Curated annotation (Swiss-Prot):
One of its GO terms (molecular function) is ATP binding. It comes from Mycolicibacterium paratuberculosis (strain ATCC BAA-968 / K-10). The record marks H17 as: Transition state stabilizer. This is Phosphopantetheine adenylyltransferase. The keyword S-adenosyl-L-methionine does not apply. It is an enzyme of class 2 (transferase).
């Protein structure tokens, strides 16, 4: 059985992320979406909200589960008995950064990283940009899964 980890903060998860999860799920027997937290950073959504949003957005992926973690991604990967990381790439800038991380992860832990080119329709989408546009009153419904869009609107209107 082969398994891979899709790590990130996912604050919130976007349709670009879901696209990467779908493609990873098609290639690996098991996929773990790892929400890695940084205690020094305060996100818009707490950990439980992020887990719920990803679970609600990926019900169609039976070989995917969501877990939380801290520390090095490679430690998370190895502790689950997996040997691969899957990362989506939007731009050349993403590639430059992720390539260095991939090489370090291979060096320190023997963990391989597989890059997935983001679908062109999501190449400009980021969690930060979606939040910023939504905060300014813009429509981000084509950038976020419906459960996420709903929760974001509720949070911004003070109902969450």
């Amino acid at each position: 059985m082969t398994g891979a980890v899709c790590p990130g903060s996912f604050d919130p998860v976007t349709l670009g992320h879901v696209d990467v999860f779908e493609r990873a799920s098609a290639q690996f027997d098991e996929v773990v979406v790892a929400i890695l937290t940084n205690p020094a950073k305060k996100g818009m959504f707490d950990l439980d909200e992020r887990i719920a949003m990803i679970e609600e957005s990926t019900t169609h992926l039976s070989n995917l589960r969501v877990e939380a973690g801290q520390g090095l991604v490679v430690d998370f990967v190895r502790s689950r008995g997996m040997t691969a990381i899957v990362k989506g790439l939007r731009t050349g800038t993403d590639f430059e950064y992720e390539l260095q991380m991939a090489q370090m992860n291979k060096h320190i832990a023997g963990v391989d990283t597989f890059f997935v080119a983001t679908a062109p329709r999501y190449s400009f989408v980021s969690s930060s940009l979606a939040k910023e546009v939504a905060m300014l009153g813009g429509d981000v419904s084509e950038l976020l899964p419906e459960p996420v869009n709903r929760r974001l609107r509720e949070k911004l209107s003070g109902r969450s």
